[in-house]
Amino acid sequence: MHKHQHCCKCPECYEVTRLAALRRLEPPGYGDWQVPDPYGPGGGNGASAGYGGYSSQTLPSQAGATPTPRTKAKLIPTGRDVGPVPPKPVPGKSTPKLNGSGPSWWPECTCTNRDWYEQVNGSDGMFKYEEIVLERGNSGLGFSIAGGIDNPHVPDDPGIFITKIIPGGAAAMDGRLGVNDCVLRVNEVDVSEVVHSRAVEALKEAGPVVRLVVRRRQPPPETIMEVNLLKGPKGLGFSIAGGIGNQHIPGDNSIYITKIIEGGAAQKDGRLQIGDRLLAVNNTNLQDVRHEEAVASLKNTSDMVYLKVAKPGSLHLNDMYAPPDYASTFTALADNHISHNSSLGYLGAVESKVSYPAPPQVPPTRYSPIPRHMLAEEDFTREPRKIILHKGSTGLGFNIVGGEDGEGIFVSFILAGGPADLSGELRRGDRILSVNGVNLRNATHEQAAAALKRAGQSVTIVAQYRPEEYSRFESKIHDLREQMMNSSMSSGSGSLRTSEKRSLYVRALFDYDRTRDSCLPSQGLSFSYGDILHVINASDDEWWQARLVTPHGESEQIGVIPSKKRVEKKERARLKTVKFHARTGMIESNRDFPGLSDDYYGAKNLKGQEDAILSYEPVTRQEIHYARPVIILGPMKDRVNDDLISEFPHKFGSCVPHTTRPRRDNEVDGQDYHFVVSREQMEKDIQDNKFIEAGQFNDNLYGTSIQSVRAVAERGKHCILDVSGNAIKRLQQAQLYPIAIFIKPKSIEALMEMNRRQTYEQANKIYDKAMKLEQEFGEYFTAIVQGDSLEEIYNKIKQIIEDQSGHYIWVPSPEKL
């Protein structure tokens, strides 16, 4: 039977196969907001619609289409073990089951003609199939999808593919779902050949417990190789990552080669490659060891070193279905807090790099038939329980409240993806009776916190589920907060009052990761620099309630964020002292006006302003009818500017500068320059703030006028400006709000990697200049971009410009926080 034929008894199958046969195009799942991609086709080959974090309340309409990259990253197989293959259906029965004991997956349907169903029956050994049950968390299911018959993610494949696993979400906690898995079924809904919006709808309506059937390509077999390597002047000449507590690939404790150092022993030998897995060094087994142990084993070797490595199979080369490159996917996630790609030195034999910190190992109970965290409240034991947790990068992963008047210590919040959450043993509403034998039945909050802090790496907790007591305690806290709020409003004290600011919007001027804040009183909300937040309750001095605002509307998820006061207090404590830097306003040397002095925009304009601690900037929404100017700052800005204009000349342009220099014979006034006859007139215009930047070179004035920029903007083109950070503020004052993007280098080594002709001293100078630039103008940036290659940075910048090119933008508000 042809795969597009249907069973007359199964309307659902008929509709799906009819759609597949006709290839009927419906509106993309991300709604009517999307405009044609100015950077080429974005919806076809490999472009994701980016649905992420399915919520039990609403489904975000779209998280942004990713421009097609110019180069394809090297793909590293994950080696992930896959679950059982569904059994063959019994002839004559219409209810085949997965895993033997699961619910009926195809009621009233005897369809066995689908390609994937034939593969389940073992007709294709390239794929494995798995049933995955996920419990919808606070942030939804925790993954993004792309694809469908109306918008294939992979050429000639209408499947629905997983494009992103969100850290800390339900899918990441479960650990079985992976990027590039193809979703075949959501509960009773077949999504193997449907339009994208149908898959989104199925996930949205799936309920709190979601059963997925997924298909994934089987990992290729590894090749074991023995390599004898003679150390050179740079040691063995390669970098490693991974190990217990420092997983390079989530769920995998292996030690991986992540870099081959140019000119080193490994490169000269030629057999080792990035992505190889180290199994042993000399007689020391490197499987399931800590990162530090692997480094020590490689360091404590003689000149001749015996290595045993596992090389990944070549099946996934240039394969759209291949597993993701986890090296690039996961290492960037923690850059806000520590540079995990920074070199720790060669350690004599090998360069060591710290990777994305993975969650602690999950005990077997996580995959028990009925995990504790899925039990109904009435089924959960009320007897004291013994729980053993192992601290991770986020501590134990839960918050406590109580300790007043002998009321007890209660668990108030469990961090998604943290040790407590992954164990499934601890619940919100648990009363902590003891920690490592220390009795906490009558402890104060401070005593309980101290006991948990001193508990060491392995913590034994005795807890008792007391939801009624905790509920009474919560009610008491709520009443106290209401009293404090009313008192604050009536007294007129405090920084922000709900009664005064019922709808307050701010732009975040820093990155915040809720998983790294152990002091959160309740569910937190993570955000990045430049994100717009709707603060719906700012009455508390320490914590605000807020939700994220996307280009397509407000998120339904409400979370707690640190208040402006708390951010500044913590930062001052970190710095110990507040540093002040006068803003000189000195013009940058650039291509258009080399050697300009700062005679006309000197220290007098911005001098005296403090380097304030950046937290939040109040903003308001404004409608505009022009194309916003674009200012790129930081390393490689010239290359990015050139690429934007050359690739999209119909969308980007440059303005004509002014000068008092006499016109040359081959120059055209108004085309090469606006030639100003009177120096006095140009000086007056500069003083009247009609120029965003100006300076003097060889006794002639040069400058970029606001009117020149406006002329380009009103023609519908983004005016590319090669100017200093001072120009951002001047454009804002002129009601021409630029898209200001700062390229922030990850490290000196990263700069050298992107431009191998640079010396360390040159890269160090560029890095220092970039850090000073961020310190001086950070509050004016629209976005901050980082990447491991120029291609990655360029693609991110294009996406930011597209996101910021609508008719409605967020601009600074005169309100004071």
Swiss-Prot record:
Gene3D superfamilies: 2.30.42.10, Guanylate Kinase phosphate binding domain, P-loop containing nucleotide triphosphate hydrolases, SH3 Domains. InterPro entries: DLG1-4_PDZ_assoc, DLG1-like, DLG1_PEST_dom, DLG3_SH3, GK/Ca_channel_bsu, Guanylate_kin-like_dom, Guanylate_kinase_CS, P-loop_NTPase. Residues 501-571 form the SH3 domain. The keyword Chloroplast does not apply. GO terms for molecular function: ionotropic glutamate receptor binding; kinase binding; phosphatase binding; protein kinase binding; ubiquitin protein ligase binding. One of its GO terms (biological process) is chemical synaptic transmission. Residues 627-802 form the Guanylate kinase-like domain. It comes from the Eukaryota. Keywords: Acetylation, Intellectual disability, Phosphoprotein, Repeat, SH3 domain. The keyword Metal-binding does not apply. It is linked to Intellectual developmental disorder, X-linked 90: A disorder characterized by significantly below average general intellectual functioning associated with impairments in adaptive behavior and manifested during the developmental period. Intellectual deficiency is the only primary symptom of non-syndromic X-linked intellectual disability, while syndromic forms presents with associated physical, neurological and/or psychiatric manifestations. The modification Phosphotyrosine is found at Y673. Residues 130-217, 226-311, 379-465 form the PDZ domain. This is Disks large homolog 3. GO terms for cellular component: adherens junction; AMPA glutamate receptor complex; basolateral plasma membrane; bicellular tight junction; cytosol; extracellular space; glutamatergic synapse; neuromuscular junction. The modification Phosphoserine is found at S139. It comes from Homo sapiens. Belongs to the MAGUK family.
